[in-house]
Each structure stands twice: as structure tokens, then as C-alpha cells.
Amino acid sequence: MGLVAAAATALVLAVTPVQFVQAHGSNGAFAETGGPADAALTSWAVLGLRAVGRLAPGSLAYLQSQEGLLQSTTDVALVALAEQALGAQPETLRARLRSATRPSGLIGESVNSTCWAVLALGQASRATTRYLLAQQAKGGGWSWAVGGQPDSNDTAAALEALRVAGVHGAPVTRGAKFLLSFQNRDGGFELTHGRGSDAQSTAWAIQGLVAAGRKPPRSAFAYLAKLKRADGSYRYSARYVTTPVWVTSQVLAALAKKPFPLAG
């Protein structure tokens, strides 16, 4: 049975988020309905499933088969994180991340890729820690790249990276406060101010706050609950349904209150 047919058949019985995600996997690879499987989505599915203690049979072999096709530092780090969550030691991918580290502490192409690399490596050099701290804006947040507008997702990722780096105190407190400024009256968090709440930004915020040692607002979980659909998936927002496997996988990790990296 093909991937799409298998997903369609299993989806009929899917009633929980875990079952929904599992229904979109075949031989360890995951895909959105009607779309091709890829390493990035498979990694997100693995992270979501492992966060709630579920297995992802065949996914490690699939991800390892895709390593040579990975291009960006962020993709390398994402797959490494997923393989680690499956109990592997992705040394080849970690070596690529270490080789992408510059004297300034930047890893890869951006602030974002640096955060992901730290999560995948499970540690940060002094230079990289200084680099991340130097990129914190006056308001307390981080942006995707140097000089960009700070947003909730990148701030959450930075807080998770600082946790790995062992940073505490004022930078983390300021970051958490900035992150909370993105919460709306509906309980959800938005990517940038005025954009409106969405499930993925809310999931990132929950993970970031947990990484910062803060208790996520109950209203954030209530917002996510309102986005849950009958088939077990989560809407991207109150208005849109898009990339449900990706969205639901991210929500699973948030509901488990587990920041990255996950233990293998």
C-alpha cells in the first residue's frame, strides 16, 4: 500500500493527535496528505511522537538515508535532533555542525541556525554562547537573523539554546518576559505583533517558557484545545488549516511541556 493510501485508510480511525501523526507515516517516513515524504517533516513527527513517549518505527533508518541530501545548517540540526530522540548518536551530522562554526560563534547562516545547532550538539562553546547573548535585542527577544525584527519563535528557540548552554539570570528572564508579550486575549501566541495567534507559535512559546523555568499560561493550552479537530489534528489557527502533520507534531511536544533537545 502506498504512503497516501495508507494514510487515508488509517486516518479513518485516527481520533488522537498521536494517531493522526502516526497515520501519515509509512516505513518510517512522514508526509502531509497528498504530499511527498521528506526528512524535515519526518523529523518533526519523530520529535512530537517521542515527546509523548511513542515510538517511530523505521524513522531512524529513513532519516539516516537522507543525511547526504541535507543542505542547510538548520535541516542538519533538525534531523540530528530527531535521530538523537530515537536513541542514535548522529556524529556525522554533528561534525557538519561543528565545521559550520565560525570564530564569532555563529553556526551556519543565522541566529536561528545557531540556536538549532546548539540544540543538536547539546552544548555551546563560549564563543557561541557569547554570540547568542549578543544577539538579544534591547526588548529581550531574538530575531531569525542579525538586524531582524525579534519574534516569538526565534526567542523561544534562543531560550531553549541558552538552557543547553547553561545560561541563567537576566538574559533568560528578559527573554521570557518578551516572549509573554506575544500572547493574545484568546490565549494563543503570535509570531509577530499584530499577526494573530497560531498553534505553532503557541507551541514554541510553551517550550521556550519551560526552558526558561517559567510555567506556561494555562490559557495557552486552552487555546490549543480549541484548535483540535475531530480527526485528531490541530488547525494552524482559528482561520486556517494547513500542514496539519507538522502543526500537530509541534503541538505534541508542547503539550508534553518538553523543550528541545529531547532525551534519547
Where are these regions (language model features)?
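Extracellular loop and loop/strand-boundary signature of outer-membrane beta-barrel proteins
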Residues: 102-104
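Alpha-helical repeat scaffolds
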Residues: 58-66, 90-100
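Short N-terminal segments immediately surrounding and downstream of signal-peptide cleavage
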Residues: 14-28
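Secretory targeting and sorting signals
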Residues: 1-14
